[in-house]
């Protein structure tokens, strides 16, 4: 930031607004590149709750890096300052609904310092994707999110443990009016935190999640909103918490925002060679 200091007021006035915007973007990218912590997630296979075919064959997941924690309110504030087109009041209506960042005092002021380390919410898919791209990443695919979220502190796949599943389900008993805590919960075996128990999270391919109703119910499948080729296996009751996430995501449009929906980013890693 010494460049801005040395320029002085007169020098800043001579700069074009476009150059200043570009400079802010560069500062944001350089700052986040060094400060944000990502954890490496090794390659493996995933038996997803999404039945991709009749046999529900395991999915191959290549190695990637995932943000250790969800994006915070403070980090999102820094992003919209550097990218004014994503500020509340400036963002195109196509990219955000009326609830976008409504919890902030102004388009660039959180209004409460306590919000800073809490997960960013009330953010659309479009804004979340733009943030990740500015950070050199992208939103995770559903398979990447589910793969990382299957792990506990010691196991890469803890989904067969009833006690672990019960702990996750306990999150749903928390009153909706309870203020969200700061990010930084216990890490799983990969070093990733807060995949459960804090907020729902956007995924890149949220609109490719297909909700398939339980054949034992009277639900009309035409009343369910879906697109894509995946189908949720609603018979898999032990993964109820994950199914709830898919049901929520499949009901959303990319411009939607809610007070319980946040996001985190992933980055590609070089493919390992034998």
What function would you assign to each model-found segment?
Residues 3-21:
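Bacterial N-terminal signal peptides that target proteins for export
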């Amino acid at each position: 930031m010494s460049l801005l200091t040395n320029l002085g007021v007169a020098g800043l006035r001579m700069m074009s607004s476009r150059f200043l915007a570009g400079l802010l973007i560069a500062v944001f990218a350089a700052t986040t590149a060094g400060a944000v912590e990502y954890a490496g997630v090794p390659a493996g296979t995933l038996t997803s709750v999404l039945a991709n075919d009749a046999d529900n064959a395991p999915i191959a997941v290549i190695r990637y890096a995932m943000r250790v924690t969800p994006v915070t309110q403070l980090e999102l504030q820094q992003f919209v300052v550097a990218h004014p087109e994503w500020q509340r009041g400036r963002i195109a209506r196509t990219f955000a609904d009326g609830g976008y960042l409504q919890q902030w005092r102004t388009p660039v002021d959180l209004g409460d310092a306590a919000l800073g380390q809490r997960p960013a919410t009330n953010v659309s898919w479009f804004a979340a994707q733009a943030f990740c791209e500015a950070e050199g990443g992208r939103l995770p695919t559903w398979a990447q999110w589910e793969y990382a979220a299957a792990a506990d502190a010691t196991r890469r796949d803890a989904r067969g443990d009833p006690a672990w599943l019960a702990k996750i389900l306990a999150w749903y008993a928390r009153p909706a009016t309870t203020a969200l805590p700061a990010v930084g919960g216990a890490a799983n075996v990969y070093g990733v935190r807060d995949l459960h128990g804090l907020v729902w999270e956007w995924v890149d391919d949220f609109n490719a999640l297909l909700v398939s109703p339980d054949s034992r119910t009277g639900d009309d499948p035409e009343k369910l909103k879906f697109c894509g080729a995946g189908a949720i296996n609603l018979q898999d009751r032990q993964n109820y918490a994950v199914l709830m996430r898919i049901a929520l995501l499949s009901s959303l449009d990319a411009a939607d925002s809610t007070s319980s929906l946040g996001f985190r980013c992933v980055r590609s890693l070089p493919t390992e060679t034998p």
